[in-house]
Curated annotation (Swiss-Prot):
Keyword line: Amidation, Amphibian defense peptide, Secreted
Protein family: Belongs to the frog skin active peptide (FSAP) family. Tryptophillin subfamily.
Tissue expression from the record: Expressed by the skin glands.
One GO-annotated biological process of the protein: defense response
Organism of this sequence: Pithecopus azureus (Orange-legged monkey tree frog)
Top-level lineage group: Eukaryota
Main location: secreted
Gene Ontology CC annotations of this record: extracellular region
Protein's UniProt name: Tryptophyllin-T2-8
Lineage of producing organism: Eukaryota, Metazoa, Chordata, Craniata, Vertebrata
Amino acid sequence: KPWERE
């Protein structure tokens, strides 16, 4: 998911 990257 784009908000669970780093």
